[in-house]
Amino acid sequence: MVPARSLAHPHPHLVRRRRDHAAAAHGATARCDDDDDGVVTPRGPTRYMAQEPINHHQHQHDPPKQPPPREADDDHHRIQEREPLPPPTTTTRNQRLQLQLGGDGHHNHHHHHHQEVAGTSGSSSGGSSSNNGGGGTRDWLRLATGPASPGASAGSDHDLFPSTTTTAPAPQPPTPTPTPTPTPTPRHHHHDVLVLPGMPPPGSFLRPGPAMPGIPQASIPTHMLRAAPPWLPPWSPVAAPPPLLPFPHQHRAFYAAPPTTTPPASSGFDAIRVVLPPSAVAAAAGVWFVLQAAPLQGREPFLPQIPRSYLRIKDGRVTVRLLTKYLVNKLGLEDESEVEITCRGRQLLPILTLQHVRDSIWCRRDAVSPSAAPDIPTADHHQHIMVLQYGRRP
């Protein structure tokens, strides 16, 4: 038979080893029975008594603990970079007085106002008020050190005066790292330059160039100058542009003719040169012209003068052929081939438009035929209105 003591403690040597290690590590004492074969009846387990046997041989032969993986270290450093530590509170910061009045009744409004000034939370002020006895009629003074700026007062007061309640604070979501904004360079009032709309940049009036009375030369770029009409002679590249005349005429820009060695002509057309194209009002006026019977015609009988000589065509794209039909109807002729129309001594083709005749033939002085020049009237009004002569074709 197996003794009862052997059933209760099948491994007495393990119990003895536990006693030796517990006595050496924590200084605990145990009572032993000498009459038995090493069975120990230990005391009740104390607060610092080892619950499991310590096997020194197992610790000696265990492999060394592996270091944490590199990914965990990277995550740890990344979290530290994402959440910067709060700046340490130094004693050199300005100290401010935070007064909070606790209580109920008419003191509640002042208490709430001073809570906002001090930057403390409602839970911390409520816990402090309850510790004062719960009376609510006692005024108390709270002193704290914190930065003078109001932006950082809320976080500093919460750290200096934590709540006395045992409830754990709710976990706060991680705040993103604020992006550092560049500090603007301080400017002085003498660094600012007043720039008005339409005003050229400073120094543009110092550019060299021929000056024009009334208009700075720098405000008119060279590539912005518009060319003269094709029937006018071009300016010399070495000569300066002529001065601007002071009088306006239907919002057009007129320039005086360049100085020449010969005296200018008596006509006003030679003294004024039109640079800008005609306005929309002038373009809508159409083409004015005069139909005159030529003094020298190809054969007799000569064609007579029509009663209505001044005509206006609204559309400048009307061709010379339409004028020929008009003369055939007015003069009672049989065929259009009997009539020819000329301008400055040059015979006009039927396909030419009146606008082309005016711009390319009438307005060009070099297009005047020497044989037809004496036949053109010299009246002033004829110099501004296109004159077309008609006659019988030989």
From Swiss-Prot:
Q: Spans of biased composition, class Basic residues?
A: 8-20
Please give the InterPro entries that the UniProt record associates with this protein. LAX2-like
Principal subcellular localization: nucleus
> What residue spans carry the Pro residues bias annotation?
170-185
List the record's Gene Ontology CC terms alphabetically: nucleus
Q: What happens when the gene is disrupted?
A: Absence of axillary meristem (AM) in most of the lateral branching of the panicle, and reduced number of AMs at the vegetative stage.
Q: Which UniProt keywords apply?
A: Developmental protein, Nucleus
Q: Where in the cell is it found?
A: Nucleus
Keyword field contains Iron: no
Which residue ranges does the record annotate as region Disordered?
A: 1-193
Q: Where does this protein have compositionally biased stretches of type Low complexity?
A: 90-101, 119-131, 146-155
- Give me the disulphide-bonded residues: none
Q: Where is the composition biased (Basic and acidic residues)?
A: 60-84
| Regions annotated as coiled coil | none
- Entry's Gene Ontology BP terms: positive regulation of DNA-templated transcription; regulation of secondary shoot formation
- Keyword Nucleus, does the record have it? yes
Describe the function of this protein.
Involved in the regulation of shoot branching by controlling axillary meristem (AM) formation. Functions in association with LAX1 to regulate the process of AM formation. Possesses transactivation activity in yeast.
Q: How does it assemble?
A: Interacts with LAX1.
Designated name of the protein: Protein LAX PANICLE 2
Which organism is the protein's source?
Oryza sativa subsp. japonica
